[in-house]
């Protein structure tokens, strides 16, 4: 048996309950259907205070340093962000400002985002993808965007969103030798 792949998920929301966290957890669960994974979820809200007070990596408290090390050592990074005013939160960007410049080279990154309406869906390609291209990470071609209409009481109720989550996980699996039925899009 192969050892599990280390999936580190960053949920970029700062509120609870959080649709971004629900989407993150759904993606992890679906990845676990195709791959042996060991996952860790980092919630931005849990590290917001020490993160905001850290201006440079060498000033990071031990708790935050451990989070940065986890992100840098991921086999697969899942980054999910809420969308505020057309982009991801500044605190999420600040987290990645503290990541070593070369740490994410060739690391697969699955991108996800949540927003109020579909008009923010392009944040995946116009905001998040360029950030991880800078790190020379491998952003997976299929990202997952969810709007408020896809949820009811912080539960995913949209069948198209559920299908998109399955598709994203199935497309990620072959990168790690996992099984994939490779759903075809008509």
From Swiss-Prot:
Recorded hits in InterPro entries, A to Z, give: Flavoprotein-like_sf (IPR029039), FMN_Rdtase-like_dom (IPR005025), FMN_Rdtase_MsuE-like (IPR019912), NAD(P)H-dep_FMN_reductase (IPR051814)
Family annotation (Gene3D superfamilies) = 3.40.50.360
This protein's record includes keyword Flavoprotein: yes
Tell me what this protein is called. FMN reductase (NADPH)
Q: Which UniProt keywords apply?
A: Flavoprotein, FMN, NADP, Oxidoreductase
- What organism is this sequence from? Pseudomonas aeruginosa (strain ATCC 15692 / DSM 22644 / CIP 104116 / JCM 14847 / LMG 12228 / 1C / PRS 101 / PAO1)
- A Pfam entry, by short name: FMN_red
**What gene does the UniProt entry assign to this protein?**
msuE
Which top EC class applies here?
Answer: oxidoreductase
Give the family per the record: Belongs to the SsuE family.
GO-annotated molecular function: FMN reductase (NADPH) activity; oxidoreductase activity, acting on NAD(P)H, quinone or similar compound as acceptor
- List the PANTHER family hit by this protein, alphabetically: FMN REDUCTASE (NADPH) (PTHR43408:SF2)
Which transformation does this protein catalyse, written as a reaction? FMNH2 + NADP(+) = FMN + NADPH + 2 H(+)
Enzyme Commission number(s) from the entry: 1.5.1.38
The answer to keyword Flavoprotein applying to this record is yes
**Coiled-coil segments on the chain, per record:** none
């Amino acid at each position: 048996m192969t050892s599990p792949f280390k999936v580190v998920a960053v949920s970029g929301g700062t509120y609870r309950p959080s649709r971004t966290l629900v989407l993150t957890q759904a993606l992890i669960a679906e990845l676990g259907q195709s791959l042996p994974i060991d996952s860790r979820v980092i919630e931005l809200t849990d590290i917001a205070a020490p993160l905001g007070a850290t201006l440079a990596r060498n000033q990071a408290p031990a708790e935050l340093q451990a989070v940065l090390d986890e992100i840098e050592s991921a086999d697969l990074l899942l980054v999910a962000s809420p969308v505020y005013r057309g982009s991801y939160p500044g605190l999420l960007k600040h987290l990645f400002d503290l990541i070593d410049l070369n740490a994410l080279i060739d690391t697969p990154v699955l991108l996800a985002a949540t927003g109020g309406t579909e008009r923010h869906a392009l944040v995946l390609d116009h905001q998040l993808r360029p950030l991880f291209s800078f790190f020379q990470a491998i952003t997976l071609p299929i990202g997952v965007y969810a709007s408020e209409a896809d949820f009811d009481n912080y539960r995913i109720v949209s069948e198209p969103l559920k299908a998109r989550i399955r598709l994203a996980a199935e497309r990620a699996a072959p990168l790690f030798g996992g099984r994939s039925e490779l759903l075809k899009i008509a």
